[in-house]
């Protein structure tokens, strides 16, 4: 019998096993990191061979279940990240997953259906291979010893890596050891969740840190500052910026009271990083969560302000997330469950509190977060059909505009000001099942270009700056902008809005979902253009 005939006979007998290996290999090479691919493939194959030689069916299933489910989940996550964002899964995505609340996950299930199907298919495929006891395969002793060698070698390499890391950082981290070991296994993406867990623990350790600032407090003539942070808002869908549909009539009606930023850009295309960049001393080029305690809430508290944080983003996992590490420093925090309009009664209550203190009231909106069709009451829809994704997204913008109009109404007779900006934009590709989505690797300008303006009450008269700002201004410098807006600054930073804008305008550096730094100006304008700025053929965006 020739070698080819032997191979053909073996392939015929074990074709399902070969199929599993091929699917695992291709998926990991294309949609995941190719790092340590040999070890991962050996780990995968040898584990299957060991399990297939367990004679007891209940025991075989008991051992197989966690292996099958974890491997299928890992591959499905890789496919989702690659197909949706054009990048491999990373610790930034892992942090976003860990910070997602159950309500948000349920709302977004429709976006995940193809990948849930992939998870089910892969689970069944791997289970179909493992479930059959096969005496024709090498014995457990042989495959078990080989698997033990692979695991031992991987663990040794991981320990070496963790030791070098501990030597450099003067501290051992079990998360680094776990993360490194995961890269040698079929559960590669667990390494990112280990890194995210490490970040979570670091954040917990510094969340209660309240630095002391040398402050300069200047009277701006404003008593009430309302900071509104929008979510996933595209400038291209706002009539305030020239969009054809009337999505922002309330803000446009206040145009004479507004200082508009035409080219505001977010520092990052996802909330977990973009909001801390905007509200703390953290920066695009020197990202470090130890910068988070240097934030607008702690500054306002020390300056004698009464501070409030009102959020319609779920209170789930309130401790140990980047945004909540800032929010928790406010004197009063409120989390509502439902639409953004539920924040208005709490805003009214905050305004009615009799105090001689100035007030900083932060409203963190759900805004236009995907799926946009769930971001507003159906009774508030003005664009049809309501199941069209473009109509839904425009309705979510219109709903936020309505809320802003109500905020202006509450503040029009007060010495008050409102600053509004969105945490980041969104990509748009009409050829995709989910037309709107977060920016990924080398995102387009649409993922960063955000609305931003400062509204001044008519009571303040003409003594405030309402001129339009046409230069690029990154919200990564909003920490300084907000400080100057409140009149609460440190000696080393610009003291007025004009000085902040003059100092930081034109800085167009941004970070993508892969933590790479890019010049916003050099990015393609739209997702449906290729990296050189040319339109992509229909259906290939």
Curated annotation (Swiss-Prot):
Membrane side Periplasmic: residue ranges: 1-60, 132-141, 286-541
Protein's UniProt keywords contain Cell wall biogenesis/degradation: no
Record's keyword annotation contains Transmembrane: yes
EC number, UniProt record: 2.-.-.-
Primary localisation category: membrane
One Gene Ontology biological process: lipopolysaccharide core region biosynthetic process
Class of the enzyme per the UniProt entry, highest EC level: transferase
Protein name: Putative transferase YhbX
């Amino acid at each position: 019998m020739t070698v080819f005939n032997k191979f053909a006979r073996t392939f015929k007998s074990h074709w399902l096993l070969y199929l599993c290996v091929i699917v695992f290999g291709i998926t990991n090479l294309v949609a995941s990191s190719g790092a340590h691919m040999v070890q991962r493939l050996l780990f995968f194959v040898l584990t299957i061979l060991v399990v297939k030689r367990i004679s007891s069916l209940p025991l075989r299933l008991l051992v197989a279940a966690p292996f099958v489910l974890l491997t299928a989940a890992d591959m499905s996550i890789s496919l989702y990240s690659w197909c949706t964002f054009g990048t491999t899964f990373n610790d930034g995505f892992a942090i976003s997953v860990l910070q997602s609340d159950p309500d948000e996950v349920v709302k977004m299930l429709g976006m995940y259906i193809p990948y849930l199907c992939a998870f089910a298919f892969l689970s069944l495929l791997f289970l179909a291979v493992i479930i059959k006891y096969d005496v024709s395969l090498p014995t457990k002793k042989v495959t078990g010893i080989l698997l033990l060698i692979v695991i031992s070698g991987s663990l040794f390499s991981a320990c070496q890596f963790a030791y070098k890391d501990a030597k450099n950082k003067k501290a051992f981290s079990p998360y680094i050891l776990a993360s490194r070991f995961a890269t040698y296994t079929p559960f590669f993406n667990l390494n990112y969740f280990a890194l995210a867990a490490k970040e979570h623990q670091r954040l917990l350790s510094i969340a209660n840190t309240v630095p002391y600032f040398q402050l300069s407090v200047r009277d701006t003539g404003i008593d009430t500052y309302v900071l509104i942070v929008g979510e996933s808002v595209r400038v291209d869908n706002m009539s305030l910026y020239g969009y054809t549909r009337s999505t922002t009539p309330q803000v446009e009606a206040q145009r004479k009271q507004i200082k508009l930023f035409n080219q505001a850009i977010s520092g990052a295309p996802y909330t977990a990083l973009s909001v801390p960049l905007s509200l703390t001393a953290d920066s695009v080029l020197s990202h470090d969560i130890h910068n988070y305690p240097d934030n607008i809430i702690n500054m306002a508290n020390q300056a004698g302000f009464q501070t409030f944080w009102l959020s319609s983003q779920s209170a789930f996992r309130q401790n140990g997330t980047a945004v909540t590490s800032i929010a928790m420093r406010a004197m009063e925090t409120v989390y509502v469950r439902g639409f953004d309009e539920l924040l208005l009664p709490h805003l009214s209550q905050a305004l009615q509190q009799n105090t001689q203190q100035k007030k900083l009231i932060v409203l963190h909106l759900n805004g236009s977060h995907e799926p946009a069709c769930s971001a507003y009451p159906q009774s508030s829809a003005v664009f049809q059909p309501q199941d069209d994704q473009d109509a839904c997204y425009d309705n979510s913008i219109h709903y936020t505009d309505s809320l802003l109009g109500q905020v202006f109404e509450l503040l029009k007779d007060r010495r008050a000001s409102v600053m509004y900006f969105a945490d980041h934009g969104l990509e748009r590709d009409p050829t995709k099942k989910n037309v709107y989505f977060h920016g990924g690797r080398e995102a387009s300008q649409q993922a960063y270009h955000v609305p931003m303006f400062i509204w001044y009450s008519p009571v303040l008269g003409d003594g405030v700056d309402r001129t339009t700002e046409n230069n690029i201004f990154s919200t990564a410098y909003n920490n300084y902008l907000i400080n100057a807006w409140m009149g609460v600054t440190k000696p080393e930073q610009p003291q007025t809005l004009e000085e902040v804008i003059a100092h930081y305008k034109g800085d167009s550096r941004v970070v993508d979902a892969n933590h790479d730094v890019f010049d916003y100006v050099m990015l393609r304008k739209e997702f449906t253009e290729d990296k050189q700025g040319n339109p992509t053929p229909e259906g290939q965006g």
